Design a protein with these regions (language model features):
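Glycine-rich, acidic/polar active-site loops that bind/position phosphate-bearing ligands
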Residues: 1-158, 166-171, 176-392
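Glycine-rich N-terminal segment of FAD-binding domains in flavoprotein oxidoreductases
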Residues: 162
Length: 392
């Protein structure tokens, strides 16, 4: 604007990236590391529906609103879940091939594609990139989807809830922090001894807890209200999933007790000719809105047609604030007290914000009651979520 306010979504996002870069460098300097740049990376999983163009043209509500306003329950929906990761239909496969070709021409690193849970629902996921570039590429992807669908007699629906009775669409925001190409959220083989990782982990947990209202507000929309908390997407209550191993590390730090590491479980398939498989330790119940999945956090509340600038701007800025608090706390600390002071800060931070950690079932009836006892917000709708924008 003429008076200097940012009216777009790009500028606040870039400012948040600069803030996180600045504060993360300060934290790394505390650990004796000089890096050129720290960036946040994003890998957005884009869900969408494809229907026949003639069916789309016959529905004014789809044309005008992007979703159906009335209709009957389908004879067959998603009861058997056989559509999920099933064989892709030839017409859809041709659409996906052309979409890949067009996206690659634009340097969009489109990678995986598959059928989703609901009939006619699909997903495309790219290789992760720096946040700003990844979000630009996601917007290009959404635009190309609509254009290319018409080449195959199809219409692409990007609304969060185009049809009742079946799942809606979201866009998982896979977020991490990278310093000169090294992932700072990699816990290593011994996360309990990795002080640098514990500082970043504690900072992120504290950021999400202190700014859960803004996190919820950043994904608020009329379309997203149809799916959040409807047993097809995370609840509207913000919580952090860490997995059993990291949760045990956090518990040991908070309670000053030794951490008992758990050897990775092997799955016995009962077939001697097949190699043993290591059991996955990441979150598979999909009910957590903000889950640690190996070496990144997955923010699952974002809507399918949403510009991801808002949630990433909030997340980057909130984490930068906590990293600044740690770097300031460590100023002037002598080397002899370094480990003690770092562990003290991590313990105090995790203790103050442990209420946001929840590894259970977010769909359960007991969770909203438990969340209320913990003092967590439950802003179920957009009108509930937006008033925090007026807070100072």
């Amino acid at each position: 604007s003429y008076t200097g306010e940012a009216l777009d979504k790009k500028t606040p996002l870039l400012r948040s990236c600069v803030a996180l870069d600045t504060q993360a460098k300060r934290v790394l300097k505390v650990f004796g590391k000089d890096v050129t740049s720290v960036t946040t990376t994003v890998g957005p999983e884009q869900e969408y529906f494809l229907i026949k163009e003639e069916d789309y043209a016959a529905r004014p509500d789809l044309i005008m609103c992007g979703r159906t306003l009335f209709g009957c329950e389908p004879v067959k929906g998603q009861e058997l879940e056989e559509h999920y990761f099933g064989a892709i239909r030839p017409t859809v496969n041709e659409f996906m091939k052309e979409l890949d070709d067009e996206l690659w021409k634009l340097a969009v690193p489109a990678k995986t594609k598959h059928n989703e849970v609901a009939p006619c629902q699909h997903e495309l996921a790219p290789i992760f990139e720096a946040s700003s570039k990844a979000i630009d590429h996601n917007l290009l992807t959404m635009e190309k989807m609509k254009i290319i669908a018409s080449h195959h007699g199809l219409a692409c629906l990007e609304h969060e809830k185009p049809f009742d009775y079946v799942n809606g669409s979201g866009k998982h925001n896979n977020w991490s922090i990278s310093a000169d190409g090294k992932n700072l959220l990699d816990p290593s083989d011994t996360p309990e001894d990795n002080l640098q990782f514990l500082v970043f982990l504690a900072s992120i947990i504290a950021a999400v807890d202190d700014h859960q209202d803004l996190m919820r507000c950043s994904v608020a929309s009329a379309g997203n209200d149809h799916r959040l908390g409807a047993n097809e997407a995370p609840p509207a209550i913000i919580s952090v999933f860490l997995g059993d191993d990291l949760a045990a590390v956090v518990d040991a730090l908070i309670n000053d007790k030794p951490y008992q590491s758990h050897p990775k479980e092997k799955m016995d398939l009962g077939v001697p000719q097949l190699a043993d498989l290591t059991k996955d330790n990441t979150d598979r119940n999909r009910t957590s809105p903000f889950a640690f999945t190996g070496n990144k956090f997955e923010f699952r509340m974002c809507g399918s047609q949403q510009n991801l600038s808002d949630p990433n701007m909030v997340l980057n800025t909130a984490v930068a604030e906590k990293l600044d608090a740690f770097a300031t706390f460590m100023e002037g600390v002598p080397e002899s007290d370094f480990v003690v002071k770092v562990l003290a800060w991590v313990k105090d931070t995790l203790t103050a914000h442990q209420r946001i950690i929840f590894n259970g079932n977010g769909y359960s009836e007991e969770w909203p009651e438990e969340a209320a006892k913990r003092g967590l917000l439950n802003n179920r709708t957009t009108p509930d979520a937006l008033p925090c924008m007026l807070d100072q």
